[in-house]
């Protein structure tokens, strides 16, 4: 694969399974994720903090500027709000699966403003002793998180750049609740489409190299069939540049790790809690998957 088209270390063929649309029946799965910081400095590692996507995510803490940009984004692609919400629902299902499999430590990278259910709520529903670290750079994110988490043991917020895995895993706030020598679930939900392919590969490879065997990697990434549509959305969305990664590139972000079934698929068809997908056709997708680091 040519440099810039994906991770050069990945030799596996794409296993993207297309699918239909589902409505997740689980309560409280309205999305908060819209993306994250990419290859230039922005206010937060999670691009939802730009106007527009915060509103499309169904958040209550949006502002007038959010409504204006949200309207413009919807004019370009009316189904964008569906993608944001489907992404969030996938994250909750994937975290639930990891907790079901015995993972008790979670790191949410580019966490964004708190949502309900949050990662710690989803994990603790299955694993009451789960410990969670939220990582971001935006002061508003950190202040919100610390205020909400002040009375919760085993949950913390750390100010760190997700693109520096060693700094993240060594952050004193994170180390107060997370032991990287034990299996950890890393959540990279809707952040890697704000990086070019090489940068995204470097980020995921960095975490994989530092994680204990038996750890999990959760990735979701927006992708559009029409490159021009992606360019229009990127031009309108001010906090970061969107990179339109096709399925084979998104799969390469896993660095050759074996994906849990059903492999790389659309978010709404990854182990849906509603048995029968409702078929639909659209240009935008959230590609999603979960991989496990093999035992030593």
How does the language model describe each region?
Residues 224-240:
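Short, glycine-/aromatic-enriched active-site segment of Class I SAM-dependent methyltransferases
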């Amino acid at each position: 694969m040519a440099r810039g088209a994906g991770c050069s270390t990945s030799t596996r063929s794409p296993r993207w399974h297309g699918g239909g649309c589902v409505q997740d029946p689980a309560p409280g799965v309205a999305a908060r994720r819209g993306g994250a910081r990419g290859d230039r400095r922005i206010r937060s590692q999670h691009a939802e903090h730009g106007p527009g996507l915060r509103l499309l995510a169904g958040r209550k803490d949006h502002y007038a500027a959010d409504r204006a940009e949200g309207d413009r984004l919807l004019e370009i692609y009316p189904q964008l709000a569906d993608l944001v919400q489907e992404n969030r629902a996938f994250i909750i299902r994937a975290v639930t699966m990891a907790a079901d499999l015995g993972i008790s430590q979670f790191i949410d990278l580019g966490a964004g403003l708190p949502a309900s259910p949050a990662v710690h709520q989803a994990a603790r529903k299955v694993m009451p002793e789960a410990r969670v670290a939220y990582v971001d750079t935006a002061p508003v994110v950190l202040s919100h998180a610390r205020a909400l988490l002040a009375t919760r043991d085993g949950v913390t917020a750390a100010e760190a750049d997700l693109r520096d895995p060693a700094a993240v895993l060594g952050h004193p706030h994170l180390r107060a609740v997370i032991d990287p020598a034990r299996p950890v679930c890393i959540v990279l939900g809707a952040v890697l489409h704000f990086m070019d392919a090489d940068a995204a590969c470097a980020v995921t490879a960095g975490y994989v190299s530092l994680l204990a065997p038996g750890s999990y990697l959760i990735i979701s990434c927006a992708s559009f069939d029409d490159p021009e549509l992606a360019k229009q959305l990127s031009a309108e969305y001010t906090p970061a540049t969107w990179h339109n990664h096709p399925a084979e590139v998104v799969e390469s972000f896993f660095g050759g790790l074996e994906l849990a079934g059903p492999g790389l698929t659309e978010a709404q068809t990854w182990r849906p809690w509603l048995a029968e997908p409702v078929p639909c056709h659209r240009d935008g997708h959230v590609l999603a998957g979960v991989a496990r680091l093999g035992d030593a």
